[in-house]
Regions:
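Short coil/turn linker and secondary-structure boundary residues
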Residues: 3-6, 141, 150-153, 451, ...
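Transmembrane and membrane-interface helices of multi-pass
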Residues: 1-136, 529
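Membrane/wall-proximal cationic-aromatic binding patches
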Residues: 83-184, 189-204
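Solvent-exposed soluble domains appended to multi-pass membrane proteins
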Residues: 153-534
Length: 534
């Protein structure tokens, strides 16, 4: 009970700090209401004359007719985000607000809510069908039989799409980690610019050895950490307007990280050093395929101090290692919390613990606090590697580490303070690191392909030599010959050749591909599509 109260207070302090920091904008938002209260007695409402009423009605009819004419003027446009498609077929509030305005987008959302609107499946370019060639990461799925025996229109169209979607080729890295263990870590807000060789040496070693990804991003999506985890663990893009991870809790998730490892005879564990049922993890984790889930409130509080905020990653790693070390093959997943905002000593126990270790660095107090939280994770990883080495498990264990999202607890100026060589824009702010490390890789393998967290699962499945169908995941194997793409929550994207801003740039050949990735990610979630795959 005390543990839960402490955690709630930690989040309350964070929320309160955000309110204080944005007080000016909140006042501006409330200003019309405040002025109305002050001056309402001085406002006179006169009864309208019939002529004036008719004038207003006529103006509304003319405006409405003109709007319909404009919307239908590009009905035959091939642009997936044409005004006609945005109004009738496509759910894309960010771009709708830019096209129609906020008020119209809001009213359209209300209307669609009551009619249970769903995106229409708009067929884009179709790939050539790929046979079950052994050079591809595909499985023997008979899509023709599935199509012939299905009556649901959307499911049929999904079968057709995935049947003809181009799979990834196997490559020289296929199966190099076969039968090795995996420790997969989603690090709360961890960031490459907080990693210093002399301050966080283990993190520095991990990010500069194994596979080194120079153009990896961790975009933030609609539900922050929950969506970051969803993407990391499923290889799917989150769906706007819903809690994707929670919604998936009743679905067949047989292609998720734990489900795939479980299918390949691994014991699967999940750990989180915060409240066990936050974001409904006590429901979503088992459904994903984790056989044992331990967090504060369902057992971890007996092993670590769950009465501080945020809790210690070091304690969690130290006290859970023995759970899985003796298994033949294991997947251990950690969702950390020590690097959680905010980063002031007044209400962050990890900052209080480690701040003296960074006090001589030339940064502002908030940035120093952020760096100090990474020390806790660094020590956790240092001890983990020592334990693996002591038990002769290091060579047989792969360590994966990536963030859930960028550290939005820091301002843009504070982020630029961390890396003075970069002026951040809305996309570059998400550039980060991906660790895929195994001690048998003696030299760093440099990867320049553009990628993000939706690409991690297909990359790992190929490295571990799993029999999987790459067409059914939205991301791509980063180590394949496919051109990589980083997709952001407003449907902007970056490739090696292109930097596309969805709200400002008019056309790009790849924006239909981005539309497809969002559409089919949503349909997989909403239709529980994987249950149809035999």
């Amino acid at each position: 009970m005390l543990s839960g109260a402490k955690q709630v207070m930690g989040f309350f302090n964070t929320i309160f700090a955000c309110i204080i920091n944005n007080a000016f904008y909140i006042i501006i938002l409330l200003l019309p209401f405040i002025l109305f209260i002050i001056f309402n007695k001085k406002i006179n409402f006169e009864k309208l004359k019939l002529k004036t009423i008719l004038y207003y009605i006529g103006s509304i009819i003319i405006s409405f007719t003109f709007a319909l004419f404009i919307i239908n003027s590009d009905k035959n446009s091939k642009d997936i985000y044409s005004k006609y498609n945005l109004y009738n077929n496509v759910y894309y509030p960010t771009y709708s607000a830019k096209t129609f305005g906020i008020v119209k987008t809001f009213s359209l959302d209300i209307y669609r809510y009551f009619i249970n609107f769903e995106d229409k499946i708009i067929i884009n370019d179709v790939f050539n069908e790929i046979n079950n060639d052994s050079n591809y990461n595909v499985t023997n799925i008979n899509f023709d039989d599935l199509i012939n025996n299905e009556k649901d229109y959307d499911i049929i169209k999904m079968h057709e799409y995935f049947k003809n979607k181009e799979p990834s080729l196997k490559n020289k890295y296929t199966g190099i980690f076969k039968d090795k263990n995996l420790i997969f870590i989603t690090g709360e807000s961890v960031n490459i610019n907080a990693i210093k060789k002399d301050i966080t040496p283990t993190l520095y070693m991990l990010t500069h050895n194994g596979f080194v990804f120079n153009n990896f991003y961790t975009p933030i999506y609609y539900a922050s950490t929950s969506d970051g985890e969803y993407t990391n663990l499923t290889g799917l893009l989150p769906t706007e307007g819903t809690w994707s991870m929670i919604k998936s809790s009743n679905n067949n998730m047989k292609y998720s990280l734990p489900a795939m490892f479980k299918t390949n005879d691994y014991k699967t564990y999940a750990y989180h050093n915060n409240t066990y049922n936050f974001y409904n993890r006590d429901i979503t984790y088992p459904n994903l395929g984790f056989e044992k889930y331990t967090a504060c409130g369902n057992g971890l509080e007996k092993k670590i101090n769950c009465n501080i905020w945020p809790e210690s990653d070091l304690e969690m790693f130290n006290e859970t290692y023995n759970d899985y070390k003796n298994d033949d093959k294991f997947l251990a997943y950690y969702m950390t919390v020590s690097t959680h905002l905010n980063y002031k000593t007044t209400n962050n126990d990890i900052v209080k613990k480690n701040i003296n270790l960074v006090k001589d660095l030339d940064y502002s107090s908030n940035v120093l606090g952020f760096i100090s939280t990474h020390i806790e994770l660094d020590k956790a990883l240092e001890n983990l590697i020592k334990n693996l080495k002591k038990d002769n498990l290091l060579d047989d264990t792969v360590i994966v580490l990536l963030a859930d999202h960028f550290p939005y607890g820091l301002s843009k100026n504070e982020l630029e303070e961390l890396n003075k060589d970069i002026k951040y824009d809305n996309n570059l702010i998400h550039k980060n690191f991906l660790v895929i490390y195994n001690s048998t890789l003696k030299e760093p393998i440099i990867v320049d392909n553009y990628s993000s967290n939706i690409d991690v699962l297909p990359t790992l499945y190929n490295l571990f030599g799993f029999n999987y169908d790459s067409r059914l995941l939205i991301g791509n194997d980063i180590l394949s010959n496919d051109d990589g793409m980083v997709i952001f929550n407003d449907r902007s994207f970056i490739t090696k050749d292109t930097k596309y801003n969805a709200l400002n740039d008019k056309t790009n050949d790849k924006k239909n591909l981005v539309y497809d990735k969002y559409l089919y990610s949503r349909l997989i979630l909403e239709k529980d599509y994987y249950k149809y795959i035999k």
